[in-house]
Regions:
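Short, charged, amphipathic alpha-helix that recurs within catalytic cores of restriction-modification
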Residues: 103-111
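C-terminal accessory helical subdomains adjacent to catalytic cores in phosphodiester-
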Residues: 1-53, 66, 70-90, 110-262
């Protein structure tokens, strides 16, 4: 069994952990106030409501990518049917051949040893185009062989966060001539276009809007996304049924507190 598995499928005695929404999770969504949904405002999941899905996410990025999914496992009472396991590339070398694929394939084999046929796990590898464009075809082939879905953002993960707030492609962004400078330039630019900047813990609250915007603006060439396109909507579409109700409860609680403190 993989050491990172947070639950044991098929065991009705295992109850989700207590929900704690921290200040860092929702501060960007509701000023600096932390939010914890009171027990009286939602029905606590019964013990037999164990997680039905494990989303294993591999990534070369370690900050915004991880933060985007952090709300889910920190609030297991609100999201009782899903767990996420995030693994960053332990040997990341900027500009070098990504080692995350080999790590992901080996780790996936460990997870598959304890996977449930009734509730199969989902495996995703999130990557950017910026420094890895030449390796993408090889990465795609290796991921397909290991039943891992490769999720590519061009040029970076922040394109996904951008579409959480914006419905149009970033036409005003001045594209650097050097391809390797596009990601850093876009991150700087996007932070000025969105109120409060790019915030992954805020973006997940807009997941449905995010999916629609990213899909509507998606363009690919030879099976890979073109600039300002991201495949993250494919991952988010699979995750949405497991998180939709919990996010709605959080939105309601945030709105209740906003009205209370007017």
């Amino acid at each position: 069994m993989a050491a990172d598995r947070h639950y044991q499928k098929g065991n009705p005695e295992i109850e989700p952990q207590k929900s704690v929404v921290t200040k860092s999770d929702v501060a960007t969504f509701n000023s600096a106030e932390s939010v914890s949904v009171p027990n009286s405002r939602y029905i606590k999941p019964e013990a037999f409501k164990i997680p039905k899905a494990l989303f294993v996410i591999y990534s070369g990025g370690t900050e915004r990518e991880k933060d985007y999914f952090s709300l889910i496992d920190k609030n297991t009472e609100l999201f009782p049917f899903i767990r996420t396991a995030f693994h960053a590339d332990p040997k990341f070398v900027k500009g070098g051949k990504p080692s995350i694929v080999r790590f992901a394939t080996e780790k996936t084999k460990e997870y598959q040893e304890s996977a449930s046929k009734e509730n199969p796990d989902h495996y995703f590898l999130i990557t950017d185009v910026d420094h890895f464009e030449q390796f993408l075809p090889e990465m795609q082939q290796e991921c397909n062989t290991s039943n891992i879905e490769l999720i590519i953002s061009n040029s970076c993960f922040e394109v996904w966060l951008y579409y959480a707030e914006k419905s149009n492609r970033p036409v005003d962004f001045v594209i650097p001539q050097n391809k390797l400078e596009i990601s850093s330039a876009f991150k700087t630019w996007a932070n000025t276009q969105i109120n409060g900047g790019l915030k992954p813990t805020k973006a997940i609250f807009n997941i449905e809007q995010n999916i629609a915007n990213a899909e509507n603006n998606y363009v690919e060439e030879n099976g890979f996304p073109t600039l300002f396109s991201t495949q993250m909507f494919r991952l988010a579409e699979k995750m949405l049924p497991f998180v939709k109700d919990g996010l709605e409860q959080l939105r309601s609680e945030i709105e209740r507190r906003r009205i209370k403190h007017k």
